[in-house]
């Protein structure tokens, strides 16, 4: 499982010209599910996301997590995140989970994020989406499990 996490001052995702998810201050999460992933791994990743300290405290130091900062989450499925790009000029998606496995794991991830009591917006699984964001910092981290 890979999650590209970006601290944003605003972000929204559109499908067919309609906004389906939007947040202000918070984290934009691009979520890639791999073949070997399971709910236990997703649960560990969620705990990591929620507790990751990427927001500035009153002294300007990155000491606050998304809860401390009063932030929200925008979760978007993105299978291209798990592409193998080490060889050639065409990405290989052989490690990406089949949608039959990936969809329930993505939905589990979203449910676990919501269970922490934070506002969570989402894209649409397997849809063609347009994502707009203002990266705050910029602050971007690749989380892998």
UniProtKB/Swiss-Prot annotation:
It is found in: Cytoplasm. GO terms for cellular component: cytoplasm. SUPFAM superfamilies: DTD-like. It comes from the Bacteria. One of its GO terms (molecular function) is Gly-tRNA(Ala) deacylase activity. Keywords: Cytoplasm, Hydrolase, RNA-binding, tRNA-binding. A motif (Gly-cisPro motif, important for rejection of L-amino acids) lies at residues 137-138. It is an enzyme of class 3 (hydrolase). An aminoacyl-tRNA editing enzyme that deacylates mischarged D-aminoacyl-tRNAs. Also deacylates mischarged glycyl-tRNA(Ala), protecting cells against glycine mischarging by AlaRS. Acts via tRNA-based rather than protein-based catalysis; rejects L-amino acids rather than detecting D-amino acids in the active site. By recycling D-aminoacyl-tRNA to D-amino acids and free tRNA molecules, this enzyme counteracts the toxicity associated with the formation of D-aminoacyl-tRNA entities in vivo and helps enforce protein L-homochirality. A Gly-cisPro motif from one monomer fits into the active site of the other monomer to allow specific chiral rejection of L-amino acids. This is D-aminoacyl-tRNA deacylase. It comes from Alcanivorax borkumensis (strain ATCC 700651 / DSM 11573 / NCIMB 13689 / SK2).
